Amino acid sequence: MKTILVPLIGDYKENLYQLGIKEKESFHHLEEKITGLLSANNFLRYGQDILSRARALLKKKDDSFFYQCIEAYSEGLGIDPSAYMSFISLFELAAHYGQIYPELKGLLPGCTSLFEKSPDGFIHNRLIDFPLIGAFNENPRLYYWKIEGKPAILNYSCEGMAPLFFQTIHDSGFSMSIHHKPGQNYHKDGQSIFKIAFEGLFEAPSMNEFRRELRKNISVTKWGFYMMDLNGTVMCSDIDGPAMNFESYNLNESSPLIFTNIPLHNDPTGFEHFIEFCQERELWLRDKLGRRKNQHTLDLMTDVKDQKVRKWIHPVSTLSTIGAIQINLAKGLVHVKEGQAALTSSDAIFEFSLADKNERKLVKKAEDPNDFEKAWKQASLAQSYFDQGDWDLAYHHLQMAEAMMPHPAWREILKFFLCVWNFKFIGNKRELAVVYRDLKKINVPDPLKDQWVFLCMRMERKLGLVFTVHESQVSPALQNQFKLEMEVPMALFTTWMILLYPRIEILDVFSPHHR
């Protein structure tokens, strides 16, 4: 992988057309990975939603700048603009339908933004988590948009997703991150979050004006915008259809500030496990910052090997962390991490200057990964291949990860997910009985206790054993689902079990029948 700064200066239509031609192969690879993440049966079931949503968005296009850019880029990619809008719509649909279709949940970008006051100025650090290992991290890009009559924008993305502004720098002197937020609403008359961000950034002359632009829009689903300016002001806005929540801070008074995917207000029911997962990751980072020595912040945030055995909590970086960027607005410097599979502290860091956009400087060369990092990267590849339906290769990488992993808590986690995969794919009861005995010996950390109890019950029901677990052993929010699984007819139970969808990177096992 190599991060490249791509200038888009002058005629934006011609630039995007030529960019599309160059990125055609990468886009189709990206599209294959995302559609491979979706099971064929479920994909057919919500395919009409995607297409109708894309058509609705295109009807609204008029002469908007965003759609002109999409059309030019799509022409270069060799696809109809509606096909690219269908691709974008997957992220919106995932935000809403992820509870029903577990495969979609894997499309949601996980995020961590760390804002700090340092001797070098005010710093914005960002981790991007996405199930796009082998795509995003193979072709990371910094796109520099310089269009007449509009403010200059630098966005961090990858080939095939140039118009999607997950992480940007505005030339008035502010940085902006988009974070997905769990929510329950789907606003059919809303605009794509990417259109809202794209047009708002190119229209607004400042951070305050950008926030005002956000207020004029209705989103399809729930997202968060996190912004920082040269004075250390940090603004946070959650947008959910026409509703918006807002908070403001100043790093001179409140540093550091850590944000993940937790809503600013009104945590939605049904997402308790995910919210707790985000909270633990924030706690890990806060503790890590308190013990910081002379370590680059991006290395600190991806230092996954630094995990306690007792009172274990998940690090802020995950098995799907594919992007890591640091922005120093005052100095006009951008640092990015580059590495294979999930990023870790041993991976290299490169610097780009906003003043000299041809300069790419090595800040820290790649180091030899330790045993933990090797196992971590193997586990990230396991989930990636699982998402693509390559079960044999996925299982191979997960076995490798478990065999190599030196950390006791993570060994138990990986053993547990091996049991989940075996439960999903093994039909022979004798073989499954061996897996069940292995499962009963596993001592998973607290975030997986509920799922361990669920899997014990599922194994016992599938094997026709007396139940050794009870609904009272799982969290109150899951007790009704637990009881339901114990009591439904066997044919329905069997169908549900086929649809289980494990996601190692957020320590969860999704079930389509769990609402």
Protein language model features and the residues they cover:
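C-terminus-biased signal that marks the final domain/tail of proteins
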Residues: M1-P109, L201-P242, N250-G427, R437-G464, ...
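A contiguous strand-loop segment
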Residues: K60-F194, N217-F225
